[in-house]
Swiss-Prot record:
The name this protein goes by in its record: Succinate--CoA ligase [ADP-forming] subunit beta
Record Gene3D superfamilies: ATP-grasp fold, A domain, ATP-grasp fold, B domain, Succinyl-CoA synthetase domains
Cited HAMAP family: Succ_CoA_beta
Biological source species: Koribacter versatilis (strain Ellin345)
EC top class, as a word: ligase
Needed co-factor(s): Mg(2+)
Chain positions recorded as Mg(2+) binding sites: 202, 216
Chain sites annotated for binding ATP: 49, 56-58, 102, 105, 110
Gene Ontology CC entries for this record: cytosol; succinate-CoA ligase complex
Length: 392
């Protein structure tokens, strides 16, 4: 689960991580009020920041600096309601419905900090770079040595000696080292206690008056840990998520929308990824990742089918099932129900193996629906790609 920057900063503030003063607003009038309050309280200006679940907002025109209350209001009026397009939103962009109005700060240096789970090592890794304010992937590609890494023992946490090592490698002033150690340890405590899978501060800044701040905040949370954090679960903004993905989550389905034309329904994440690979190998592009899971029932399969077909880009469907816990006859019943209810006109290719496969094939045959049967994954991929391209 992702959250907005203003929500992330509220969490950081709770854990003692310094963030600029600011407030989320949804109207021009609110923006002017917050800007007025901040400037009366010593701010030299304010930053008007679009709040969407995507990076690259500055380049897309979603982050602007205002030197006066009137200018803050004008900028808020322009940004609110705009469709912001960045390298992470896709060409369709995202509509801006809220803003963060924040004080400007006397920035001296922009750096980068993040904590993410390193699955290969089975522990969190604290990453830092002197190249802040940039896409960290670009920095790593140009110079891998520019990324400082410290692996953290979960049972111990981020040691002060590790934080000091990072601070020295970043070239921080001696008078900032102690402050930086506290900042980094508070950041790790935030990551650990919220069950986050990613906390990213880009940029992490030093100011001309020797203070440290998180100028931006990005959080990803492990969905499997949200039951322990009802307060975090309430921060979810479904308007920022794909409607089909939101609908799928209601039925316990793992669905991710992609840009292709071949709809996929598979049981098991590994088989689903292999199916997507073989579709591309056959010259097609998958329209989605859809894992119905091992314990799906006929009703869930029906919902999965309806969600898959709701994507207008889908030109053909591949159902690739290896029956284990999810029996093939259960899958077949759900597919027939969904195909009958939706009066589907698209080609459907099925590759079925495993538990109760003969019963499943019998259900499909008796349905009277026109399915294309494939014996192997290669055969299935070739048939569905041809069908998506209109080749008979």
């Amino acid at each position: 689960m992702k959250i907005h920057e203003y929500q992330g900063k509220a969490i950081l503030r709770k854990y003692g991580v310094a963030v600029p003063r600011g407030e989320m607003v949804t109207t021009r009038e609110e923006a002017e009020r917050v800007a007025n309050d901040l400037m009366h309280d010593g701010a030299k200006g304010v930053v008007v920041k679009a709040q969407i679940h995507a990076g690259g907002r500055g380049k897309g025109g979603g982050v602007k600096i205002a030197k006066s209350v009137d200018e803050a209001g004008q900028l808020a009026g322009k940004i609110l309601g705009m469709t912001l397009i960045t390298h992470q939103t896709g060409p369709e962009g995202k509509k801006v419905q809220r803003l963060l109005i924040e004080e400007t700060l006397p920035i001296e240096r922009e750096l980068y900090l993040s904590i993410v789970l390193d699955r290969s090592n089975g522990k969190p890794v604290f990453m830092a770079s002197a190249a802040g304010g940039m896409e960290i992937e670009e920095v790593a590609a140009k110079d891998p040595n520019a990324i400082i890494k410290e692996w953290i023992e979960p049972g111990y946490g981020l040691g002060a000696f590790q934080a000091r090592k990072i601070a020295f490698k970043l070239g921080l002033k001696p008078e900032l080292i102690g402050q930086a150690v506290k900042f980094m340890q508070a950041l790790y405590k935030t990551y650990d206690e919220t069950d986050a899978s990613l906390v990213e501060i880009n940029p992490f800044i030093t100011t001309s008056d020797n203070r440290l701040f998180a100028l931006d905040a990005k959080f990803n949370f492990d969905d499997n840990g949200l039951f322990r954090h009802p307060d975090l679960k309430d921060l979810r903004d479904v308007t920022e998520e794909d409607p089909l993905e939101v609908e799928a989550s209601k039925y316990g389905l793992n669905y991710i929308k992609l840009d292709g034309t071949v709809g996929c329904m598979v049981n098991g994440a590994g088989l689903a990824m292999a199916t997507m690979d073989i579709i591309q190998y056959a010259g097609g592009m998958p329209a989605n990742f859809l894992d119905v899971g091992g314990g799906a029932n006929a009703e869930q399969v029906t919902h999965a089918f309806e969600i898959l077909l709701s994507d207008k880009n889908v030109k053909a469907v591949l159902i690739n099932i290896f029956g284990g816990i999810l029996r093939v006859d259960t899958l077949a019943t759900g597919v027939v129900q969904a195909a009958t209810q939706t009066k589907i006109q698209l080609p459907i290719v099925l590759r079925l193996e495993g538990t109760n496969v003969e019963q499943g094939r019998e259900i499909l045959q008796k349905s009277g629906l026109n399915f294309i049967v494939a014996e192997t994954m290669k055969d299935a991929a070739e048939k569905v790609v041809a069908a998506a391209k209109g080749v008979k």
